[in-house]
């Protein structure tokens, strides 16, 4: 599984899969706060939280005494998937693009879960109107066949021909499937359909939220939605939100499966129910 390799695990925020490797993982990775509006890491939320988040990153990159070397790249998900379906604020993404350009740092956007119409656009970063330096994509592009693609700007193309060769790379059937998937998505306006169905699903989830206070935060883009389950009886955090109810999520997942609905879990303490329905 690609995501369990040494390099990929070094970039993962979740500690669980990383523990067995311990010191073998790269120590050249610096994690930064993500614009998690419902539980803002700066205790602010909204536009103020976004502003402080960007200021923190900009100061870290420009301060020679910050103790952090200028990175080769900044890697980000425009919508966090396993992290709990957290959509990055669009102004934050624009600010991130501005900061990385000014610093001469490549911006890599991970679209493996969010790409190919899932969020109502072909790629989730398009909602912010930015252009990354590198885009990593997989999953949906292969139409169920194994295919992963890295798209990057010309100035990053320093490999010599054959330098990235491998026995199972460049599979012709998977590439043909990928081309067919992209044609289908465009010809059948799947992006527009996913955006409309996502609005519909969000609307119905918010109706349920009125009667069930355990549905703390409903978020996402298009048909990549998440519901953060909370314990209304617990002590609120600095923003006034109840604590995550991680024990409830698998119970909800199990009951939904009994009724023919497949859901995934993610987020802190596994407390986010993830909706990733078919796009068609």
What would you call each of these model-derived segments?
Residues 1-280:
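Conserved N-terminal phosphate-binding loop of PLP-dependent enzymes in the Aspartate aminotransferase
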């Amino acid at each position: 599984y690609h995501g369990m390799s040494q390099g990929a695990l070094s970039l993962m925020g979740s500690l669980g899969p990383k523990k067995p490797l311990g010191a073998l993982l790269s120590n050249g990775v610096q994690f930064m706060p993500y614009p998690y509006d419902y539980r803002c890491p700066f205790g602010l939320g909204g536009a103020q939280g976004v502003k402080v988040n960007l200021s923190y990153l900009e100061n870290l990159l420009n301060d020679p005494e910050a103790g952090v070397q200028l990175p080769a790249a900044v890697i980000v998900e425009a919508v966090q998937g396993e992290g709990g379906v957290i959509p990055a604020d669009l102004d934050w993404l624009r600010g991130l693009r501005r900061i990385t350009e000014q610093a001469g740092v490549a911006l890599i956007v991970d679209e493996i879960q969010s790409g190919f119409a899932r969020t109502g656009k072909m790629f989730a970063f398009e909602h912010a109107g930015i252009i990354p330096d590198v885009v990593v994509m997989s999953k949906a592009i292969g139409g169920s066949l194994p295919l992963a693609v890295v798209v990057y700007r010309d100035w990053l193309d320093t490999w010599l021909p054959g330098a990235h060769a491998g026995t199972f790379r460049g599979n012709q059937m998977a590439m043909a499937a990928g081309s067919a998937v992209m044609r289908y998505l465009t010809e059948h306006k799947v992006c527009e359909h996913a955006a409309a169905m996502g609005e519909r699903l969000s609307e119905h989830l918010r109706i349920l939220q009125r009667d069930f206070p355990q549905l703390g935060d409903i978020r996402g883009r298009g048909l990549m939605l998440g519901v953060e389950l909370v314990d209304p009886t617990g002590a609120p955090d600095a923003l006034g939100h109840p604590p995550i109810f991680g024990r409830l999520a698998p119970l909800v997942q199990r009951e939904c499966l009994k009724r023919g609905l497949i859901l995934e879990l993610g987020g802190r303490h596994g407390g986010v129910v993830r909706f990733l329905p078919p796009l068609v």
